[in-house]
Curated annotation (Swiss-Prot):
<feature type="binding site">
    <location>
        <position position="163"/>
    </location>
    <ligand>
        <name>(2R)-2-phosphoglycerate</name>
    </ligand>
</feature>
<dbReference type="InterPro" id="IPR036849">
    <property type="entry name" value="Enolase-like_C_sf"/>
</dbReference>
<keyword id="KW-0456">Lyase</keyword>
<dbReference type="GO" id="GO:0009986">
    <property type="term" value="C:cell surface"/>
</dbReference>
<protein>
    <recommendedName>
        <fullName>Enolase</fullName>
        <ecNumber>4.2.1.11</ecNumber>
    </recommendedName>
</protein>
<feature type="binding site">
    <location>
        <position position="242"/>
    </location>
    <ligand>
        <name>Mg(2+)</name>
    </ligand>
</feature>
<keyword id="KW-0479">Metal-binding</keyword>
<feature type="active site" description="Proton donor">
    <location>
        <position position="205"/>
    </location>
</feature>
<dbReference type="InterPro" id="IPR000941">
    <property type="entry name" value="Enolase"/>
</dbReference>
<feature type="binding site">
    <location>
        <position position="286"/>
    </location>
    <ligand>
        <name>Mg(2+)</name>
    </ligand>
</feature>
<keyword id="KW-0964">Secreted</keyword>
<comment type="pathway">
    <text>Carbohydrate degradation; glycolysis; pyruvate from D-glyceraldehyde 3-phosphate: step 4/5.</text>
</comment>
<comment type="similarity">
    <text>Belongs to the enolase family.</text>
</comment>
<feature type="binding site">
    <location>
        <position position="368"/>
    </location>
    <ligand>
        <name>(2R)-2-phosphoglycerate</name>
    </ligand>
</feature>
<dbReference type="GO" id="GO:0006096">
    <property type="term" value="P:glycolytic process"/>
</dbReference>
<dbReference type="Pfam" id="PF03952">
    <property type="entry name" value="Enolase_N"/>
</dbReference>
<keyword id="KW-0460">Magnesium</keyword>
Length: 428
């Protein structure tokens, strides 16, 4: 039987040493699922609310005992006896139980932990890998990894405003090969940074955080690493940026400390990004405008939307209501998918499906505060999202996802495909 007979929530620590929620779900058949939720550093204001204790005497207010208590009481009571195979009904029960748009009463962290653990228990009972449980038995695409090799912004303590500078192995023949290419570039980049006398310590997501003169210096350093690793920039390995622009948008201006403190209008910032795209093989820009600068987003989309993937993260926060508005207004051409921004798997899958129907791409993503949980790897494959963003080529919390993707590709064998540049179908 698939009936839920026990739910156990607990407080664990994430990759930054901050508390997060883990949940075990036990079924009548003896099957069990365990899941842990991530947490972000730069968060959109419209994200579902993760419940924190606020007790400054314990983890500086970041404890999650209230969320855990909600899991072990209200959520447990509501889900007890439900069929774990009925994911949509389970998630709808959670949403109705919380009763708020932002999931602030029970906490999106508590709700997501339950949603994920139920799915894992159901997959375990079915004898299926999680990606097969979600995605069925047909052919599947492995995702192109967006590898964050230089960190800035809220993810690092350096002079760069942009949060992530990424490499995308679009010319590889398989995910395994793409991962190898990325790892080789990462190690060459480390040597180049060290040779310049800069620190090779890594940031929250495993990328380097050197103090460079400006953003173009960072881009040029990455291109040099790609070339010295033996690869062709652009055709084999392209570049991506996560600007996280909301972090440096104030009073209608984008103020870039890493560019000499210049303050730019939306049009001027769009022009700067367009200039970089003309000079360098940049094919993806995330949060190129601030989450509330919809006019700026429209300018950027009109200017670059036919040749560059424009990903809405803080803009859309994995929310179908906001995504629908963006599609209607012709804003962006891609959505970043973060499961903890919305709080249930059902709503996550709905956002991916809505994006695809509109010709937008969907990039499944980690958060800067992660755990060893690798659910997003299975989601990326199961939904044929074809892109994943899960950090650099270091830190075991990031490698957990990459290694799971290696296992999935091995298991799929000849029915796995690697789309490469075709993953960017929004640019055709």
């Amino acid at each position: 039987m698939s009936a839920i007979v026990d739910i156990i929530g607990r407080e664990i620590l994430d990759s930054r040493g901050n508390p997060t929620v883990e949940c075990d779900v036990l079924l009548e058949s003896g099957a069990m699922g365990r899941a842990a939720v991530p947490s972000g550093a730069s968060t959109g204001t419209r994200e579902a609310i993760e419940l924190r204790d606020g007790d400054k005497n314990r983890y500086f207010g970041k404890g999650v005992l209230r969320a855990v208590e909600n899991l072990n009481t209200e959520i447990s009571e509501a889900l007890m006896g439900l069929d774990a195979q009925e994911q949509t009904f389970v998630d709808r029960t959670l949403i109705e139980l919380d009763g708020t748009d932002s999931k602030e009463r029970l906490g999106a962290n508590a709700m997501l932990a339950a949603s994920m653990a139920v799915a894992r228990a159901a997959a375990d009972e079915s004898g299926l890998s999680l990606y097969r449980y979600f995605g069925g038995s047909g052919p599947m695409s492995m995702p192109v990894p967006m590898m964050n090799v230089i960190n800035g912004g809220a993810h690092a303590n350096n002079t760069l405003d942009l949060q992530e500078l990424m490499i995308l192995p679009v010319g590889a023949a398989s995910f395994r090969e793409a991962l190898r290419w990325g790892a080789e570039v990462f190690h060459v980049l480390k040597k180049l940074i060290h040779a310049q006398g800069m620190s090779t310590a890594v940031g929250d997501e495993g990328g380097f955080a050197p103090n460079l003169a400006n953003h173009e210096a960072a881009i040029q350093l990455i291109l040099k690493a790609i070339t010295e690793a033996g690869y062709e920039p652009g055709t084999q390995i392209a570049l991506g940026l996560d600007c996280a622009s909301s972090e440096f948008y104030r009073d209608g201006k984008y103020t870039l400390a890493g560019e000499g403190g210049v303050s730019l209008s939306s049009q001027e910032f769009a022009n700067l990004l367009a200039t970089w795209c003309d000079k360098y093989p940049i094919i993806s820009i995330e949060d190129g405008m601030a989450e509330n600068d919809w006019d700026g987003w429209k300018l950027l989309t009109d200017q670059l939307g036919k040749k560059v993937q424009l990903v809405g993260d803080d803009l859309f926060v994995t929310n179908t209501r906001i995504l629908r508005e963006g599609i209607q207004k012709g804003v962006a051409n891609s959505i970043l998918i973060k499961i903890n921004q919305i709080g249930t798997l059902t709503e996550t899958f709905a956002a991916i499906e809505m994006a695809k129907r509109a010709g937008y791409t969907a990039v499944v993503s980690h958060r800067s505060g992660e755990t060893e949980d690798s659910t997003i790897a299975d989601i990326a494959v199961a939904t044929n999202a074809m892109q994943i963003k899960t950090g650099s080529l270091s830190r075991s919390d990031r490698m957990a996802k990459y290694n799971q993707l290696l296992r999935i590709e091995e298991e799929l064998a000849e029915v796995a495909s690697y789309p490469g540049i075709e993953a960017f179908y929004n640019l055709r």
